[in-house]
């Protein structure tokens, strides 16, 4: 499995240009080290919208889904630092999916990613997963592309956290998450319009109305980088 574990935390939000410099400093030098110090957090990656807009995409790769309800993680979620409390309100239109990894093929750290938020038609989850698993092997070998990863949200059985309270309990959720990785933006956009276009996904078993975006890698780290 190419992702570094059986689970992942995938998040999207908007960050204003005015808040972004401090956000990136905090995120790289306090937040990533804090999260990567939690047992089971294996890699953290932050991306910015490729079109220069306000969008941010962050993915944490986790040993397994139980990490999301672990005492060590909950302790951090319920005791955010003063700097974190100051930055949290700037995370606008947050979507936060706590996922099990369903399929993972090829590279997971690349200069560009296409993320797609989708859901299966009732009764067609198996069809959709099988079709995307088959496609993943072809995508990983195409010029400009290196990998395709499919995840499904499954909320852990935990109480609302202090971080959620600071954000106003307004987090959205993506049901299924598809992340295509590559080194060429045009190749990712072509993938988004063809093999992973809305018509193609509907034929595989997805509901209409997917959400998608292309992002550029800003920073990626593992626990070993924090030493």
Give the residues covered by each predicted segment.
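Macromolecular interaction modules
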Residues: 1-227
């Amino acid at each position: 499995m190419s992702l570094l574990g059986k689970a992942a935390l995938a998040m999207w939000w908007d960050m204003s240009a005015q808040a972004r410099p401090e956000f990136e400093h905090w995120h790289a030098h306090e937040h990533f080290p804090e999260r990567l110090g939690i047992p089971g957090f294996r890699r953290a990656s932050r991306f910015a919208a490729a079109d220069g807009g306000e969008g941010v995409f962050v993915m944490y790769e986790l040993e397994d889904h139980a990490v999301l309800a672990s005492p060590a993680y909950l302790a951090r979620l319920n005791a955010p630092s003063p700097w974190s409390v100051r930055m949290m309100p700037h995370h606008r239109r947050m979507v936060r999916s706590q996922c099990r990894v369903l399929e993972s093929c090829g590279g997971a750290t690349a200069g560009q990613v296409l993320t797609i938020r989708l859901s299966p038609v009732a009764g067609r989850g198996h069809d959709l997963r099988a079709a995307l698993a088959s496609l993943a092997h072809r995508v990983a070998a195409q010029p400009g592309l290196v990998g395709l990863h499919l995840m499904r949200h499954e909320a852990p059985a935990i109480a609302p956290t202090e971080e959620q309270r600071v954000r106003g309990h307004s987090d959205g959720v993506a049901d299924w998450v598809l992340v295509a990785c590559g080194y060429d933006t045009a190749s990712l956009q072509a993938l988004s319009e063809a093999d992973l276009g809305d018509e193609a996904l509907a034929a595989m078993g997805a509901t209409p109305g997917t959400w998608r975006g292309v992002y550029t890698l800003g920073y990626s780290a593992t626990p070993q980088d924090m030493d």
